Amino acid sequence: MPSFDIVSEVDLQEARNAVDNASREVESRFDFRGVEATFELNDANKTIKVLSESDFQVNQLLDILRAKLLKRGIEGTSLDVPEDIVHSGKTWFVEAKLKQGIESAVQKKIVKLIKDSKLKVQAQIQGEEIRVTGKSRDDLQSVMALVRGGDLGQPFQFKNFRD
């Protein structure tokens, strides 16, 4: 029986490249001359710390970072940015988290979405991924389109497609 896995992963090497590109752009921009503005990628926590001297500049830095992530093939919805910007001394910062894996609430929404579609497929939750099996390849491709089209708040990839 054909099957595939639905996963949500961020390539950390591409994220590192995007952070480096964003840092290079900030160094060359006129509006950030003489301003302490940095990006720090923490591989262990899978977070990106955006630091600057004002909250407005932090928002500008986040826009630059999102653009660079998108150019490297990482969707903006994979970056979980908290609403509040932390003020510490003379700097403002925000620590954005890269979404890795599918949370259980989102997994349940995906399984419910697949079951409500009345396609002849089965969806099983396996850790941080979902295995979808069915008799027809066309049904599996319909499920892929359904998951891509559903507004679930994070990007998904499809792996281990087997016939």
From Swiss-Prot:
Query: Which InterPro entries does this entry report, sorted A to Z?
Result: DUF520, UPF0234-like_C, UPF0234_N, YajQ-like_sf
Q: Write out the entry's keywords from A to Z.
A: Nucleotide-binding
Q: What GO CC terms are in its UniProt record?
A: cytosol
Q: List the disulfide bonds.
A: none
Recorded superkingdom? Bacteria
List, in alphabetical order, the Gene Ontology terms for molecular function in this entry. Answer: nucleotide binding
Family matches, as NCBIfam families: PRK05412.1
What does the record give as the function of this protein?
Nucleotide-binding protein.
**Similarity annotation:** Belongs to the YajQ family.
HAMAP family in UniProt: YajQ (MF_00632)
Kindly provide the name given to this protein in its UniProt entry.
Nucleotide-binding protein KPK_4305
Source organism (scientific name): Klebsiella pneumoniae (strain 342)
